[in-house]
């Protein structure tokens, strides 16, 4: 694990229409290889109520909190990684990645 600043979507739903607002957070990063061989970078950030896991490329958070960072890392099992791997290929995921990219660009200009 390494220190990492990343963006997380501000939304309770994984709906690309509502995922256009992001906030920058500081935490830790870890690149994990999926069962199909894709490498995905995850961010781990601590909030007052627990640890959260975010796909760094899209800012989409896994909708569960964990007591410790190690429990959050352990939750990235083969089943969950397979779900994330499949999601990377759908259009909604690509739309969110595009929205995050535009948000970062606009944030740097402002």
Residue ranges and their predicted role:
Residues 66-83:
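A short, charged, amphipathic alpha-helix used as a generic interaction element across diverse proteins
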Residues 80, 85-101:
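Anionic, Ser/Thr-rich low-complexity intrinsically disordered regions
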């Amino acid at each position: 694990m390494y220190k990492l600043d990343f963006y997380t979507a501000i939304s309770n739903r994984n709906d690309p229409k509502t995922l256009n607002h992001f906030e920058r957070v500081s935490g830790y990063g870890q690149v994990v290889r999926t069962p199909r061989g894709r490498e995905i970078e995850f961010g781990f950030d601590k909030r007052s109520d627990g640890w959260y896991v975010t796909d760094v490329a899209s800012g989409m958070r896994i909708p569960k909190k964990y007591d410790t960072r190690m429990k959050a890392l352990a939750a990235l099992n083969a089943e969950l990684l397979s779900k994330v791997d499949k999601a990377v290929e759908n259009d909604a995921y690509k739309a969110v990645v595009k929205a995050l990219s535009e948000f970062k660009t606009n944030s740097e200009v402002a």
